[in-house]
Amino acid sequence: MNQMNVTGMNPGAGGPVGGVPMMNNGSTAPRNDGNVNNIPETMINNLNTYIYDYFLKRGYHECARALVKDESIKLNTEPPTKTSPGHRREDMNGVEGDAIMTDSKDGDKIKIPDDLPRPNLASESQQSSFLLDWFSLFWDFFWAQRKKGNSNDVRQYLQHTQNMMRLREQQHNQLLRQQPVMPRQMGPLNMRRNGMVPANLQKTVLQNNTGGLSQQQIAQLQKNQQMHMMQQMQREHSDMDMNGHRPQSPSSAENAPSPSKRPRLENGPMNGQQLAPNGRGQGQAMPGQPNSQALLMQNGLNPRAMNPAQFAGFQQQGPAAQQKSIQVYAQNLALHHSRSALNNQGIPNGLMNPGVMPNQTDLVPMPDGQGMYPMNGDYYGTNGQMAQVRAGMQTPGGQHGNHALQDYQMQLMLLEQQNKRRLMMARQEQDSMSRADGQPPMPGQQGLPPGTSPQGSRAGTSPNPNEQMKRGTPKMPQTGLPGSPNAADAMGQNRGSPAAMNFNGGQMPPDMAGGQFFMKGMPDAMGGPNGMRPPSSNPAFSGPQMGQPIPAGAVNRVPSGNWQQQQGQPMGPQQSPAQQPQSTGTPQTQNSMPPPQAPPAGANAARTSPQSQNAAPPTPQQANKPAPKKREPKDTARKRTTKKQPAAAAAAANTAATPSSEAEHPPTTPTPSTPITPQHPSSFNKAGPNPTTSAPQQPTSAPAPQPIVQQPPPDQTQQSFNDLSIPDASAFNLDFSALENPDILENFDFDTFLNTDADTAGFGFDPNISYPTDGVETGAGDGL
C-alpha cells in the first residue's frame, strides 16, 4: 500500500482521519492556497454557525438561544431586527428570504422565535440541516472503512475512488520520472528542425550514465530512435488528406511509409532524444502533446492491459496516428459488441440476414412479403424448384428477422449489392452491345455466366428501342428487341420475351392465371438450372406454375424453345417483338387489320366457316386483282398488298416449304405503304380473309421432308376482332409458335422493312397518307 493510502485511508484503529481531505499530496500539513475559508478561526465560526442552524431546524430553540447569549461563541448571523415587509434587508419584492427555512415539507411552519437571528450560511436554501447531512455521509464512510457498514453503495464508491487514486498516483510518478529529461530533450529537437545538430551531442549521450551499454548498443538505439522520429514526422502530415481520415488498425503495417520513401538511416544526424539515467529511451514527449498513457487513460483504456509490443508501437506513433488508432479501436470494439449481441440472439456469425449463407448473393423480397429469393445464376435449383428463402426455412440457429436494426442493415447490404451488380451489367452491356462484323452478340453475353446476362435480367423495354432494333435480329427474341407501341398493355414492362421468365404475374388479372397460359410441355420448352436466364430486376410473379420441377434432361435442350399449346401442336413462327399478347383490360385490334370497306360477296360467309387446311387451295382474294393507280386513304387492296410483300419476302428467305397461298400471288408494283406496326410475316392467315384471336398460323420454319402440320378448327367460343367488346377473358390465349429452328428471323431485314425511303425497296413510309381511324390499330383520335 502506498504512502497516500497508509496515511489517509487506512489509519490504525482509533487513529486520526484528518488525512483524507489531503490525499493528493500525502501530507497532513494544512494547505495554504490563499483561500480565507482555510483559516482556522473562520472554520470554527462556520462550524458554530452550522451547529446553530442545526438547533434551529431541529427545534432546539433553548440550545440555540444559549449559543446566542454566550459571547465566547461567535456566529455568522443576520441582525434580528426587521422593519416592514416591504423594506426588509436583503428581501426581494417583499418576499421573506427565509421562507424555505420556516416552511417544512408538510406545509407546517417551523416556529422560530423572533429574538433568535437567522444564520448567515451559503446553504440556507436547504430544508434539512447541513450538519446533519454531512454527519450522515461521514458516518457511512467511517464505518465502511472499518468494514462495519452494510451499505453496498458505499463499498462501490470507495472501491472506485481508490482505483482512480491508484491510477492517478502511477501517472503522477511516471511524469515525475520523465520531467528531468524533457528540458534537455526539447533543445536538440528544436535545433534539429533548424538544421543544426550540436557536435558534442553524442559525447553527452555517452557520458549520461551509460556505463552498462556498449557503443554498438548505443548506436543501434540511436538508429532506431531516428527511424521512429522520421516515421512520426512523415505520418504527421496525414491530417491534410483531402478525402478525410481513413481508419487503420493500430497493429497494421500501413502506418509505415513505403520502402521507396524510407529515409536512409546510415550517416544521418543523430536523434535528439536523450537517454534516461537507467539507459532506456524515453517516449517522445513534445510540449503541448499529451503523453501516450495519459491519452489512453483519457479515452478509457488501461495501458497495463495492453501488450508491451502494442504499447511500444503506440508510443512510437505520432499524435495524429495515435488519435486514429484510438478511434479505430473504439469502432472495432463497438463492432465486436454488436456482433456479440447478434450471436447472443441466435444469429450465426453475426450475420444480418438469418437463414442465408455468408456467400449468398442478393436477396429480393417475394411479392407476398413472406420470403426472399436469391438474385444469381442458381435462381432455379437442381430440381427445378425456385430457390426461395422463406421465413420458416432458416438455419437451426437462426431467428426471425423482426428487429428494426437488423432489417435496416440487411436492406443496406442488399442495396449495395444490387448497385454493384447493376453497374457491372451496364458495363458488360456497353462492351458487348454490337460486334464489328454487324452480327449480334451471342445470347449468353461473352464473359458472363448465364445467370448474369445483362439483358435477360431486366424487365421492361429499352430506353431507346430504335437503336436496339438496328443491332440485327438475335436468335433469342427476348434479348433486346423493342416493346409494343401499345402503351395501355398491362404487360408493357415485360416485352422482352413471351416466356414466363419476364412475365409479370403481379399485373395479370386473376382470371387469366389458368393453365392455358402455362403449357404442359414445360420441360420441353424451358432450360434447366443453368440454361435459363435469371429473373428480372423486379419480379412479381410467384405463381405455382414456376414451382413445377424441371427434369435434369431439359438442360441440354435448345434454350430458345417455343411454348406449346395445351393440345401439343406447334404454333406458327415467333411473332415480331412489336406484336405481343394483348391485355385483357383493353382489347384492341392490334394484330390484325379490319376487313375491307367493300368486301366481296362471299367474304362474310367465309368468316363463320371453319378454317381450311394448309393443303387446300387458297381462297380467292381481292388484294391482287386491282392495280393501284392513286393514293386513296381507303384503298384496302393496297394495304393488304403491302402486308404480303414483307411476308412473302421473309417467308421465301427463311423456309424451304412455303405454302402455295403465298407463292401464287407475286407482289405488285412497289408503292408506298400505309403506316403500320411491324408485323411478323405470318401474322395473317392466308387461308381465310379474317383470322380470329387464336387462328393458328402457318409453319414457315418446318423442314421440307416433314409433312405440313394440320391445324385444328378454331374455337367457336372465340370472337373476331370486329367485336371489340370481349367479355370473356378466356377467349384470349397466348399462342406462341414453335421455335424448334432458331433461324426463323435470322435473315429478316428489319432495316429494309422499316425503311422510310419510298424509292428503294417499295416498303417506304409516306407520312402524307391519311387513313381512317377505324382501320388503324394505333389510332387514338380522329386522325394522325
Curated annotation (Swiss-Prot):
Which residue numbers delimit the LisH domain? Answer: 43-75
| One of the GO biological process terms | positive regulation of transcription by RNA polymerase II
Places the protein is found: Nucleus
What are the UniProt keywords, alphabetically?
Answer: Activator, Nucleus, Transcription, Transcription regulation, Virulence
The segment annotated Disordered runs over: 75-122, 212-295, 424-726, 764-784
What residue spans carry the Low complexity bias annotation?
215-233, 247-259, 564-592, 644-661, 691-701
A cellular component term from Gene Ontology for this protein is: nucleus
Q: What domain of life?
A: Eukaryota
* Assembly and oligomerization: Interacts with ptaB.
Q: What does this protein do?
A: Transcription factor that controls the expression of genes related to the process of conidiation and adherence and regulates biofilm formation. Controls conidiation and adhesion primarily by affecting the expression of the three regulatory genes flbB, stuA and medA. Required for virulence in an egg and a mouse infection model.
According to UniProt, the name of this protein is Transcriptional activator somA
Q: From which organism does this entry originate? A: Aspergillus fumigatus (strain ATCC MYA-4609 / CBS 101355 / FGSC A1100 / Af293) (Neosartorya fumigata)
